[in-house]
């Protein structure tokens, strides 16, 4: 779908005695090359805590090749402050194609390799947080839970917020 080879890392929780064949939820982590170790540590710590409801999770860290292309909903030359410089080349707009890759290619490949239980989380930060919200807005059935950390809502002069406002009234979340 993306016409390129994508790398990813996988963490599988340790199986305890008597839990052979146990399946786990899968947390898909965008910007995986930046956050893999901290998210694995977080899930290990909180899934072993008696005060947390987080179950042990498989973590699939999706590595980046072009964040702007993959995580943004529109092609834009607008800067963070909304201005457009005539020398800036428009970029981005590949979020829908990247969503197809996640669901139609990566998820199928992962589910053939790991003991997944069918529950899936999507986690993204910044541009990936924008992608996470875009996926929730346009394809809410794709994941069971969404975590968007500091999403880049400024992208293309706030186009996501404009689209999401329309979607809220058209969809049943």
Model-derived regions: residue spans:
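Non-catalytic cap/lid and distal C-terminal segments of serine-dependent acyl enzymes
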Residues: 1-173
């Amino acid at each position: 779908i993306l016409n390129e080879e994508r790398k990813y890392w996988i963490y599988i929780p340790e199986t305890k005695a008597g839990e052979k064949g146990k399946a786990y939820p899968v947390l898909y982590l965008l910007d995986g090359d930046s956050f893999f170790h901290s998210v694995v540590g977080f899930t290990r710590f909180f899934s072993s805590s008696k005060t947390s409801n987080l179950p042990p999770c498989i973590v699939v860290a999706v590595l980046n090749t072009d964040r702007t292309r993959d995580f943004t909903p529109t092609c834009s030359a607008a800067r963070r402050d909304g201005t457009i410089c005539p020398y800036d080349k428009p970029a981005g707009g590949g979020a829908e194609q990247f969503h197809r890759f996640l669901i139609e290619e990566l998820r199928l490949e992962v589910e053939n390799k790991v003991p997944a239980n069918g529950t899936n989380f999507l986690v993204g930060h910044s541009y990936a947080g924008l992608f996470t919200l875009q996926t929730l807005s346009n394809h809410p059935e794709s994941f069971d839970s969404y975590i968007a950390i500091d999403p880049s809502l400024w992208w293309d002069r706030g186009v996501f917020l404009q689209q999401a406002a329309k979607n809220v009234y058209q969809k049943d979340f």
